[in-house]
Amino acid sequence: LTQSAEGIDAMLSPTLIELFRYPVKSMMGESLTATEVTETGIQGDRAWAVRDERRGGIRGGKKLPQLMTLGARTGPDVPTITAPDGESAAANSDYINEWLSDKLSHPVSLWPLLPAEQLDHYRRGAPDTEDFELELRTVFGRLPDEPIPDLSGFEELLEFESPPGTYFDAFPVSIMSRQSLENMDQLDSECRFDVRRFRPNLLIDIPGSEHPFPEQLWVGATLSVGSVVLKIESTCPRCSMTTHGFADLPRDTQVMRNLVGHSEGNLGIYASVQKAGSLSINDAIEVLQRPSVARDRPNDVR
C-alpha cells in the first residue's frame, strides 16, 4: 500500500465535530449545529462582501485585515454586522456603507452576491505594488527566502478576487481536522493555532491516523458527510490572514513561519459539492471513492 492508502485505512470513523458559516467574507462567523449545503456551499456562507472604494475590487482580510475584527451573524433577511465597540448594523441599512467605512477606517461598500456574468464586479482591484512577486509574498505572508504557493489550478484567481458568482477564495467548502490544529500546537506551544484563524466550514475528528495532517490524504477522494457528497479538490494554501490579530487572538507572524516550515504553507483542504444535502454535528464521514492517484506527498498544492 502507498502512504496515502495506508493512512486512509488507518482512519477510525471520522466525524464532523464543528460547523461554521461566515455570512460576510473575511468577518468572524457563527457556529451551527446543522445546515443545508448547495453546490455553492453552506447556505448563507460568504453571501456578502465589501468592495474597496479606493482601489476597486472585492476585498477580504488579505488586503483589509480590519475586516476580521467585525462579526457577522445571519438574520431573518440579511446578516447583522457587529463591531468591536459593540455597535451593530444590518447589511441592508441605508447607512451601512458609511458605517463600515468608519469602522474599517477605509472607504468600502457592502454587496450581496451578484450574477457570475457581472465579471467586473469580481475582477481584482489595483494591486498595492507593480512587483507581482512582492504582491504575492505580502498576500501570502511569505518572507523573501520562503517559497510562494504553487497556484497552478488557481489561475482564475489571478484575475478575479473570487470565482465569479461567489465570494469564497477558491472552492465552496473548506475542511480542517482537529488533529492538524493539535499537531501545529504541539510543534510550537508559543503559537495559538486556534480554529478561528483558519476559518473552515467543517472541523472534523479523524482518529487513528498517524499522519500529522490526516485530511490531506483525502485530496482527490470523494466523501459523504450527512446527505452531502464532497469531492476533495486540493490542500488549502494559507495566506497572511492566519497571522492577523482579532478578538482575543494576537497578531502572530510565527503562525506562518510554522506553516511554511512544517506543512509547506498549507493547512486543511478544499472541496467542491457533488451532491447537495444537509449536514449536522456528529455526522459520520465516509470515503466513497479513494484518490485515483495515490499521493505520497499529500500536502503538495495542486
Model-derived features: positions:
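Metal-cofactor-dependent catalytic cores
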Residues: 2-302
